């Protein structure tokens, strides 16, 4: 599946193809849009369309070359209303200097200059043409080129460059955005050569459930607390307060061998006490 329309320097490595397959970027939907037919490899017996990952890699390189052609990185706007792509576009923007719109796209952001969120990008990249339809529609009004991650059933109206991939899986979306960011940095010279691996793991671009993140944070705090209490207790309680275990114990304040201050004659001591056999004194008044 190696792309034949690219210079040899842009050819995908076996690791890149394996990563695309492992992320299930080649698994499309059962529906097929007519403009996505050239990117189809085959249709399985269960009706699922399989995407040609060689075509996917070609479009990743093409999209990266278009993004690199923009002089100011901030003039590129990456958009994702789909939750699985929000973390990916934020990381892409952080690594490449682009603007990110993660979540709901405010209508009028490209056409209404009165709004606070008004932007004038020279290029937009969207995660899903269906969920990001408002952004694509406004971009068509102001002549902004559009790059989109398109599944086999995605509408391609007003899309200039379609990257054929699975745009519904969390791993597939993160993998494509990670590869696109890496290719942009390679073309800009941030990554010196193609043999040098990028030190950013692809896992950073994957969607994570907020509840799972909160649980992981609680577990980390518990483990950190256990690790801090153990050495701290040993150092402060035993090491500093314990002293020398073999040292002789200090003498008591008063000698235990001295005779206690007790009466010598118990009979004389009891003489002043009233006899238990005597009758009780009469009460002063009657109830």
Curated annotation (Swiss-Prot):
It comes from the Eukaryota. Keywords: Cytoplasm, Ribonucleoprotein, Ribosomal protein. InterPro entries: Ribosomal_uS2 (IPR001865), Ribosomal_uS2_CS (IPR018130), Ribosomal_uS2_euk (IPR027498), Ribosomal_uS2_euk/arc (IPR005707), Ribosomal_uS2_flav_dom_sf (IPR023591). The keyword Cell membrane does not apply. GO terms for biological process: ribosomal small subunit assembly; translation. One of its GO terms (cellular component) is cytosolic small ribosomal subunit. Its main location: cytoplasm. Residues 235-287 are annotated as: Disordered. GO terms for molecular function: structural constituent of ribosome. Residues 247-261 have a biased composition (Low complexity). Pfam families: Ribosomal_S2. It is found in: Cytoplasm. The keyword Ribonucleoprotein applies. Component of the small ribosomal subunit. Mature ribosomes consist of a small (40S) and a large (60S) subunit. The 40S subunit contains about 33 different proteins and 1 molecule of RNA (18S). The 60S subunit contains about 49 different proteins and 3 molecules of RNA (25S, 5.8S and 5S). Interacts with RPS21. Belongs to the universal ribosomal protein uS2 family. Required for the assembly and/or stability of the 40S ribosomal subunit. Required for the processing of the 20S rRNA-precursor to mature 18S rRNA in a late step of the maturation of 40S ribosomal subunits. This is Small ribosomal subunit protein uS2. It comes from Pyricularia oryzae (strain 70-15 / ATCC MYA-4617 / FGSC 8958).
